[in-house]
Amino acid sequence: MRWPGWLTLLPGWRARLRVLLPLYIATWLAGYCALLGLGSVSSDPELLTITGTLMTLGFILSLVLRLASIPRRAILLLLGCVGLVLGLLQLRQFTVSVPGSAAVAPSILPALGFAWLLVILSYTLVTNDWLLFVIPLSLAILGLSGTENPNPDMSGYFLVFAVASLFAVSYHNYLRYVPVQR
């Protein structure tokens, strides 16, 4: 398998990937369970597709940026530039609609806002502490969407969320005490 040239130049990136991947997967799973919970109360099928895809791409990009040792300030600047471009595109279209907002009950709008915050945040997860911030946002999304439509699916999403969150917090604590190549 041939890797990109800039990735092979980093010393020890495979060992770092092996150490960081379980934490990224566990927090991604916790966030995705929240999006699934929101998708179960929304009648818009595109909402889960768009938010899930963007969040997954954000997690992958964050992991690659972390392996490449890109400074956090550069990532925030990049995120700000992308947000500015997207904002200008929205102004050009003279629309303020967010995918999913038309098909969601008014009581779910805060959960929808948290879901989009989770999607934006997924592009900046370059430290272990930032990764753990996915858990409270996901819990808020699950709680807000679970009060609107309590169904058996929500119990399953919460169970998977709880297991993934417990693993992420435990693994984060493990990484604090084990010397890791950073």
Across the structure, where does each feature detected by a protein language model lie?
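Linear, non-domain "peripheral" regions
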Residues: 1-182
